[in-house]
């Protein structure tokens, strides 16, 4: 398929604000799609990489400016002036393409595959002189582009497509195009993480095919998520009685895949951390009695001297570490607490009830202290006994407890009433930082006030819900402390615009934010604002696609209005 067709779709979607109309346009487009499903659907998501691929093109704005200059024979200074004028390098590329003095005699039509493969190729260029090679390769792609194509190729390269299309809209469009349910599309995508494959299955096999997609060892999936409960009674009301009540550990949730001696470790945000945890790989090889298995566990750091658990921020150092890995493994050892299993020796287990999955997990885990153990848990129906177990967990320094429906299947990628978490803290939200302000006086040189946003899952946009500057320290006194300097260094690479003291950053850094209540507010696009927000911690284990949604914020607000929600 010619890329021009996809660029025309992008252009149309960019002008439409109504979600229903966006869905209809994409559905019509998908119905006519004959091939190149993988490439087309990834580009529609504004990327050329699958969610589990830790890759990027490695071309920043300066490199794109050079590529535009080379491709269209325009002075670099002129390109920079256009950027100042329009503030969007996609539009700059479109204008520069229209302005070029010497057009190719034979303009070869670009295909979707051409664009996809070239952008992937750029990401793979490494070594000496790689930046120049990337820019030349990108410039060659732009040479063959028409103005509108150039606009979206540049935006794709910068991962800023700006067409207001997220997973929710794509899900609904696939459902309409092929007469299947959105639930079936979402289920299949949560396992495959490939909308191109989901489209192919929906087209060829329909609803039944989507519900029958299978997990593959060595390929990650989206894990099941918990909803929150405010007390023991509410937790039982959601999951039913009796329930499995398990300790909630303050660590990193891992999905662990094993095939023979090969082991893969992924975090919740689908980050491959196999290399960072050689000790965990050895534990799985030696203590998990299965040839092929996919299970979940919490990796928790502990202090060798005191035998006490370490705070989450301490173990997060290991996830970020790229060197001295063996040394770090000795300094911050971790142990695994296994809590669920979804695949064993060729058998798909997601549709089995939790009590059966737990029994299978118990059979394959060869427990050893400070290596791997099953999560501590009890089966209970009594409020008082459940509350006592909850208090016991808190007294041991654990984060809280999980209540689980004994008869529930495993629902990947969704917050459903099959498991809930109960913690003693204020209500918190996982949000992404989208803007900040430079400090003054002794805080000059640091970003000190942070604008946080929630996800509109349909459009993929991030809508602001407040500004927060508390919960952050000037000096690090404990391992779990967050400093202004630390947040500033994390955000600096993602600054893309500055207006006076305010900077705008790409939505990359996720923080957990506590608050007193949610209020309606015309100040923010979301229509809501957090009252007395405070940053609790940086969520290195959360991706921007996993943060709390606007729907979640609306839900909490409605609960408050009904007098149900009490802090």
UniProtKB/Swiss-Prot annotation:
<feature type="binding site">
    <location>
        <position position="246"/>
    </location>
    <ligand>
        <name>ATP</name>
    </ligand>
</feature>
<keyword id="KW-0132">Cell division</keyword>
<dbReference type="GO" id="GO:0046872">
    <property type="term" value="F:metal ion binding"/>
</dbReference>
<keyword id="KW-0436">Ligase</keyword>
<dbReference type="GO" id="GO:0071897">
    <property type="term" value="P:DNA biosynthetic process"/>
</dbReference>
<dbReference type="InterPro" id="IPR012310">
    <property type="entry name" value="DNA_ligase_ATP-dep_cent"/>
</dbReference>
<protein>
    <recommendedName>
        <fullName>DNA ligase</fullName>
        <ecNumber>6.5.1.1</ecNumber>
    </recommendedName>
</protein>
<comment type="similarity">
    <text>Belongs to the ATP-dependent DNA ligase family.</text>
</comment>
<keyword id="KW-0460">Magnesium</keyword>
<keyword id="KW-0547">Nucleotide-binding</keyword>
<keyword id="KW-0067">ATP-binding</keyword>
<keyword id="KW-0227">DNA damage</keyword>
<dbReference type="InterPro" id="IPR050191">
    <property type="entry name" value="ATP-dep_DNA_ligase"/>
</dbReference>
<keyword id="KW-0233">DNA recombination</keyword>
<feature type="binding site">
    <location>
        <position position="339"/>
    </location>
    <ligand>
        <name>ATP</name>
    </ligand>
</feature>
<dbReference type="Pfam" id="PF04679">
    <property type="entry name" value="DNA_ligase_A_C"/>
</dbReference>
<keyword id="KW-0479">Metal-binding</keyword>
<keyword id="KW-0131">Cell cycle</keyword>
<keyword id="KW-0235">DNA replication</keyword>
<feature type="binding site">
    <location>
        <position position="298"/>
    </location>
    <ligand>
        <name>ATP</name>
    </ligand>
</feature>
<feature type="active site" description="N6-AMP-lysine intermediate">
    <location>
        <position position="248"/>
    </location>
</feature>
<feature type="binding site">
    <location>
        <position position="415"/>
    </location>
    <ligand>
        <name>ATP</name>
    </ligand>
</feature>
<keyword id="KW-0234">DNA repair</keyword>
<dbReference type="GO" id="GO:0006273">
    <property type="term" value="P:lagging strand elongation"/>
</dbReference>
<dbReference type="InterPro" id="IPR036599">
    <property type="entry name" value="DNA_ligase_N_sf"/>
</dbReference>
<dbReference type="GO" id="GO:0051301">
    <property type="term" value="P:cell division"/>
</dbReference>
<dbReference type="InterPro" id="IPR012340">
    <property type="entry name" value="NA-bd_OB-fold"/>
</dbReference>
<dbReference type="InterPro" id="IPR022865">
    <property type="entry name" value="DNA_ligae_ATP-dep_bac/arc"/>
</dbReference>
<dbReference type="Pfam" id="PF04675">
    <property type="entry name" value="DNA_ligase_A_N"/>
</dbReference>
<dbReference type="GO" id="GO:0003910">
    <property type="term" value="F:DNA ligase (ATP) activity"/>
</dbReference>
<feature type="binding site">
    <location>
        <position position="253"/>
    </location>
    <ligand>
        <name>ATP</name>
    </ligand>
</feature>
<dbReference type="InterPro" id="IPR000977">
    <property type="entry name" value="DNA_ligase_ATP-dep"/>
</dbReference>
<dbReference type="GO" id="GO:0006281">
    <property type="term" value="P:DNA repair"/>
</dbReference>
<dbReference type="GO" id="GO:0006310">
    <property type="term" value="P:DNA recombination"/>
</dbReference>
<feature type="binding site">
    <location>
        <position position="421"/>
    </location>
    <ligand>
        <name>ATP</name>
    </ligand>
</feature>
<comment type="function">
    <text>DNA ligase that seals nicks in double-stranded DNA during DNA replication, DNA recombination and DNA repair.</text>
</comment>
<dbReference type="GO" id="GO:0005524">
    <property type="term" value="F:ATP binding"/>
</dbReference>
<feature type="binding site">
    <location>
        <position position="268"/>
    </location>
    <ligand>
        <name>ATP</name>
    </ligand>
</feature>
<dbReference type="InterPro" id="IPR012309">
    <property type="entry name" value="DNA_ligase_ATP-dep_C"/>
</dbReference>
<dbReference type="Pfam" id="PF01068">
    <property type="entry name" value="DNA_ligase_A_M"/>
</dbReference>
<dbReference type="GO" id="GO:0003677">
    <property type="term" value="F:DNA binding"/>
</dbReference>
<dbReference type="InterPro" id="IPR012308">
    <property type="entry name" value="DNA_ligase_ATP-dep_N"/>
</dbReference>
């Amino acid at each position: 398929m010619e890329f021009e067709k996809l660029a025309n779709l992008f252009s149309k979607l960019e002008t439409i604000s109504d979600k229903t109309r966006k869905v209809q346009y994409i559905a019509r487009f998908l119905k006519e799609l004959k091939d190149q499903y993988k490439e087309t659907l990834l580009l529609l998501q504004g990327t050329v990489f699958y969610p589990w691929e830790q890759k990027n093109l490695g071309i920043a704005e300066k490199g794109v400016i050079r590529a535009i200059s080379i491709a269209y024979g325009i002075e670099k200074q002129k390109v920079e002036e256009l950027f100042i004028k329009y503030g969007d390098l996609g539009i700059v590329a479109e204008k520069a393409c229209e302005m070029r003095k010497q057009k190719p005699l034979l303009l070869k039509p670009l295909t979707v595959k051409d664009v996809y493969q070239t952008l992937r190729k750029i990401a793979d260029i490494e070594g000496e002189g790689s930046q120049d090679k990337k820019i030349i390769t990108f410039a060659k792609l732009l040479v063959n582009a028409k103005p509108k194509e150039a606009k979206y190729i540049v935006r794709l390269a910068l991962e800023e497509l700006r067409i207001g299309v997220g997973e929710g809209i794509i899900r609904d469009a696939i459902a309409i195009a092929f007469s299947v349910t959105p639930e079936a599309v979402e289920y299949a995508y949560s396992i495959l993480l490939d909308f191109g494959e989901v489209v192919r299955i929906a087209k060829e096999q329909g609803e039944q095919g989507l519900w029958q997609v299978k997990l593959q060892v060595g390929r990650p999936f989206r894990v099941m998520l918990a909803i929150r409960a405010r007390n023991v009674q509410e937790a039982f009301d959601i999951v039913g009685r009796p329930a499995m009540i398990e300790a909630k550990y303050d660590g990193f949730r891992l999905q662990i895949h094993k095939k023979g001696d090969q082991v893969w470790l992924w975090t919740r945000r689908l980050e491959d951390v196999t290399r960072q945890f050689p000790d965990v790989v050895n534990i799985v090889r030696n203590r998990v009695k299965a040839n092929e298995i996919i299970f979940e566990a919490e990796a928790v750091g502990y202090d060798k001297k005191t035998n006490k658990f370490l705070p989450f921020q301490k173990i997060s150092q290991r996830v970020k570490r790229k060197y001295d890995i063996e040394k770090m493994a000795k300094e911050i050892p971790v142990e695994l607490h296994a809590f669920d299993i979804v695949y064993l020796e060729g058998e798909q287990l997601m549709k089995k009830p939790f009590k059966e999955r737990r029994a299978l997990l118990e059979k394959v885990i060869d427990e050893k202290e400070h290596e791997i153990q099953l999560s501590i848990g009890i089966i209970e129906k009594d409020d008082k006994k459940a509350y006592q177990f909850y208090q016991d967990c808190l007294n041991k320094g654990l984060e809280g407890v999980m209540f689980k429906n004994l008869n529930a299947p495993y629902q990947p990628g969704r917050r459903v009433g099959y498991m809930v978490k109960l913690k003693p803290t204020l209500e918190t939200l996982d949000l992404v930082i989208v803007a900040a302000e430079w400090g003054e006086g002794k805080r000059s040189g640091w970003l000190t006030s942070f604008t946080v946003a929630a996800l509109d899952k349909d459009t993929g946009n991030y809508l602001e819900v407040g500004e927060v500057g508390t919960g952050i320290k000037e000096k690090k006194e404990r391992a779990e402390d967050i400093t202004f300097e630390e947040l500033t260094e994390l955000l600096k690479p993602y600054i893309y615009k500055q207006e006076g003291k305010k900077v705008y950053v790409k939505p990359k850094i996720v923080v957990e934010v506590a608050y007193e209540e949610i209020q309606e507010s015309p100040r923010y696009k979301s229509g809501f604002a957090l009252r007395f927000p405070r940053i609790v911690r940086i969520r290195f284990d959360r991706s921007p696609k996993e943060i709390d949604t606007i729907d979640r914020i609306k839900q909490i607000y409605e609960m408050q209005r009904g007098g149900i929600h009490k802090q």
